[in-house]
């Protein structure tokens, strides 16, 4: 066992050869490297599989013998300072390594097909390999300096992958927004690290915790300064895990390829902030005010993310806000001191949300054959609908992921979210009400996404599919923007844009690529409607096996991964794997309880949380099930149609919620007005002062000297005698002034 731990330092470097060899190969042998591109994919998957096996082996050992292994090498710079670097293996490290490697492998398999038509295929896999190395280095770091180094590398990889299609202005702006927002958090993290080193004199986690606790117990340090340093440490995770108010970058990050959204912005990178708070929890836990701030930020993010997801039209942005809300649950659990619940939800959410993102990518991939290669159209849920019979496997996988996130048993997220809701009841009634209400909102917006995408008919080909008697309709311009138009009621179908279905554009050059034959030669389907028009249209098709296989594996994880943490304890014996891993575990809410959850309490709380979820699903079903169905006869909907006054109030409420959600809670607008515009004005004023005042003085002195020299040159007439005469005249004037000054003094 000790022999295994000695070689754990190699874990972060196993995926590193692929990006290095790809970079060298593309520089020196570009043609050969591109011709062997499938080999690089296989090599990436193979190396990450080694990491997964290694991590699984470490986890199995720690289940039976829970221990912490740390190995440190010291680099002495001088007698007063030495830099130590090494690796730190504990249950948290092994779990995160398994999570990174398993999701990473599935995303790489998925990406092989998803990115096959992109000219940046090799660049994509190089970035992915470098990201996996950075993330593994982060979770195995033994001190704060190493954490910060890999933290920055993870941010750089995120910047590169969000802006992967950098020729699109919206993607370029999105990666810059993510970079700048995370720099705010990273600066706070750096200040916190330096402050802690100034107090404790160490960067190592174990030494840091011991010294910090001793200082607190003996009152040998200013508590206010300690609190400030701890808060600055927390600012980094706020930005990285998209917590309020530094969450604004996450929805825009969806401009990157969909596999990136599944790996980085659902399962791993955004979880890095949760990981760091969990790693530093022994430090935070001795400062109650910091724990309360962590829980407060978490509960605000939980509610804000859920409300902002309510009216999103882009399927990936809706899932992004859902991710933000679920990360808020994890942060809330950590702030309450429920270490196990937070990490349990981190695991279950990672697999469920990765499944949903890969499912959305499969849908987008299928819609591109219909609406063309435009994210504004292929990701717009308003143009989807009726996909159940066209993509049945994707639909089933997406439904399982949706039910899991809603908290429906026995799926993965039910077990972890239920623990957090139970702990919130013990922590604060107000927090519990917000957390439980948000569970209902989660079920509502997730089923809204599902119903808009899969139920009804394909809305791309239909007008007036909302069922309203008088309405204006949205047509799609050539560039994917919605334009409001009044359409003729005599026509039952929206005329399609003229599209060339034999070619697919690339963002990087004018060359086009043919779409595979299974897209071109798909069966034509005739849609008859209103008796007047019979037209022939394309319909989406199921994705290829290399896209479906990772989704099916994640579906199995979503079904069964919750079993590792089912909280059934009897006679002091832990039956779940997580309890064996996290021994001893930090739990401030169950300090005096031998059995965390008994049968009666579990079923009572589970019944309550599941009832809330089903209520949210029911409301979503009533509002978003296609209006041409029999649901119009439901009493709930007829109430709003019969009572005009209540209907007006209801519509005002709906419009308020819609505007709040669609405009991102006006937070982006506030930042733009209060920060961005102010900084721009300051920059313009600084630029004016620098160029007109500072440069003006410098240039004025130079120009004055030049003119004085020119005047002197012409007065002297280019003769030495004239220069001597002027020189002596100036000396005489100077002596006269000096004489009068000296005479007046005496």
UniProtKB/Swiss-Prot annotation:
Domain of life: Eukaryota
Keyword annotations: Chloroplast, Membrane, NAD, NADP, Plastid, Plastoquinone, Quinone, Thylakoid, Translocase, Transmembrane, Transmembrane helix, Transport
EC number: 7.1.1.-
Pfam family, one: Proton_antipo_M
One record GO biological process: electron transport coupled proton transport
Topology relative to the membrane: Multi-pass membrane protein
Principal location class: plastid
Protein family membership: Belongs to the complex I subunit 5 family.
GO cellular component labels: chloroplast thylakoid membrane
Catalytic reaction equation(s): a plastoquinone + NADH + (n+1) H(+)(in) = a plastoquinol + NAD(+) + n H(+)(out); a plastoquinone + NADPH + (n+1) H(+)(in) = a plastoquinol + NADP(+) + n H(+)(out)
Role noted for this protein: NDH shuttles electrons from NAD(P)H:plastoquinone, via FMN and iron-sulfur (Fe-S) centers, to quinones in the photosynthetic chain and possibly in a chloroplast respiratory chain. The immediate electron acceptor for the enzyme in this species is believed to be plastoquinone. Couples the redox reaction to proton translocation, and thus conserves the redox energy in a proton gradient.
Name this polypeptide is given: NAD(P)H-quinone oxidoreductase subunit 5, chloroplastic
Localization annotation: Plastid, Chloroplast thylakoid membrane
EC class: translocase
Species this protein is from: Lepidium virginicum (Virginia pepperweed)
Molecular functions (GO terms): NADH dehydrogenase (ubiquinone) activity; quinone binding
Entry's transmembrane regions: 9-29, 40-60, 89-109, 125-145, 147-167, 185-205, 221-241, 258-278, 280-300, 327-347, 354-374, 396-416, 425-445, 547-567, 608-628, 723-743
SUBUNIT field: NDH is composed of at least 16 different subunits, 5 of which are encoded in the nucleus.
């Amino acid at each position: 066992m000790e022999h295994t731990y000695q070689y754990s330092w190699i874990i972060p470097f196993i995926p590193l050869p692929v990006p290095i060899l790809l970079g060298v190969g593309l520089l020196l042998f570009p043609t050969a490297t591109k011709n062997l591109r499938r080999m690089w994919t296989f090599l990436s998957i193979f190396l990450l599989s080694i990491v997964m096996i290694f991590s699984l082996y470490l986890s199995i050992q720690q289940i039976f013998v829970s221990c912490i292994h740390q190995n440190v090498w010291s680099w002495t710079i001088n007698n007063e300072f030495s830099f130590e670097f090494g690796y730190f293996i504990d249950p948290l490290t092994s779990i995160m390594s398994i999570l990174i490697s398993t999701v990473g492998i599935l995303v790489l398999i998925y990406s092989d097909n998803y990115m096959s038509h992109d000219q940046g295929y090799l660049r994509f896999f190089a970035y992915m390999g470098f990201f996996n190395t950075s993330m593994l280095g982060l979770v195995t770091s033994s001190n704060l300096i190493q954490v910060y180094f890999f933290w920055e590398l993870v941010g750089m990889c995120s910047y590169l992958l969000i802006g992967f299609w950098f020729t699109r202005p919206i993607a370029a702006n999105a990666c810059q927004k993510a970079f700048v927002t995370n720099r705010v958090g990273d600066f706070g993290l750096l200040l916190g690290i330096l402050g802690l080193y100034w107090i404790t004199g160490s960067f190592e986690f174990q030494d840091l915790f011991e010294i910090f606790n001793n200082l607190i117990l003996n009152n040998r340090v200013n508590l206010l300064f300690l609190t400030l340093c701890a808060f600055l440490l927390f600012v980094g995770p706020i930005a990285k895990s998209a917590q309020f108010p530094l969450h604004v970058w996450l929805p825009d990050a969806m401009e990157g390829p969909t596999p990136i959204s599944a790996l980085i912005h659902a399962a791993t990178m955004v979880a890095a902030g949760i990981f760091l708070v969990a790693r530093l929890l022994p430090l935070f836990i001795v400062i109650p005010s910091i724990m309360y701030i962590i829980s407060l930020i978490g509960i605000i993010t939980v509610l804000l993310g859920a409300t902002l997801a309510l009216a999103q039209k882009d399927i990936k942005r809706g899932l992004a806000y859902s991710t933000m809300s679920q990360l808020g649950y994890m942060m809330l659990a950590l702030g309450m001191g429920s270490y196990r619940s937070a990490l349990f939800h981190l695991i279950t959410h990672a697999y469920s949300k990765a499944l949903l993102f890969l499912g959305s990518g499969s849908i987008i991939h299928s819609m591109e054959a219909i609406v063309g290669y435009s994210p504004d159209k292929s990701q717009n849920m308003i143009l989807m609908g009726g996909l159940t019979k066209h993509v049945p496997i994707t639909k089933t996988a997406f439904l399982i992921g949706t039910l899991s996130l809603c908290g429906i048993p026995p799926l993965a997220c039910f077990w972890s979210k239920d623990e957090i809701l139970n702990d919130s009841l013990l922590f604060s009634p107000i927090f519990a009400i917000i957390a439980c209400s948000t569970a209902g909102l989660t079920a509502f917006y997730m089923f809204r996404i599902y119903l808009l995408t899969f139920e009804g008919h394909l809305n791309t080909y239909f007008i007036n599919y909302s069922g309203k008697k008088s309405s204006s309709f949205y047509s799609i311009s050539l560039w994917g923007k919605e334009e409001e138009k009044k359409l003729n009621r005599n026509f039952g179908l929206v005329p399609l844009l003229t599209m060339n279905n034999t070619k697919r554009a690339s963002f990087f050059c004018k060359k086009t690529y043919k779409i595979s034959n299974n897209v071109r030669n798909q069966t034509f389907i005739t849609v008859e409607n209103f008796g007047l028009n019979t037209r022939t249209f394309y319909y989406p098709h199921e994705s290829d096996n290399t896209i479906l296989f990772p989704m099916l594996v994640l579906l199995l994880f979503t079904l069964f991964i919750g079993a590792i943490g089912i909280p059934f304890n009897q006679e002091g014996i832990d039956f779940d794997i997580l309890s064996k891993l996290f021994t001893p575990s930090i739990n401030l809410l169950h300090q005096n309880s031998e059995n965390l959850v008994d049968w009666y309490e579990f079923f009572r709380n589970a019944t309550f949380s599941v009832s809330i979820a089903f209520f949210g699903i029911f409301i979503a079903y009533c509002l978003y099930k296609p209006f041409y169905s029999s649901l119009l006869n439901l009493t709930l909907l007829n109430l709003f149609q019969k009572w005009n006054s209540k209907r007006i109030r209801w519509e005002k409420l709906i419009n308020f919620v819609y505007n709040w959600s669609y405009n991102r809670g006006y937070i982006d607008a506030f930042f733009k007005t209060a920060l961005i515009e102010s900084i721009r004005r300051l920059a313009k004023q600084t630029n004016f002062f620098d160029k007109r005042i500072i440069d003006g003085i410098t240039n004025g002195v130079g120009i004055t000297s030049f003119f004085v020299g020119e005047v002197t040159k012409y007065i002297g007439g280019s003769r030495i005698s004239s220069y001597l005469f002027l020189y002596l005249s100036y000396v005489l004037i100077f002596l006269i002034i000096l004489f009068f000054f000296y005479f007046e003094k005496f």
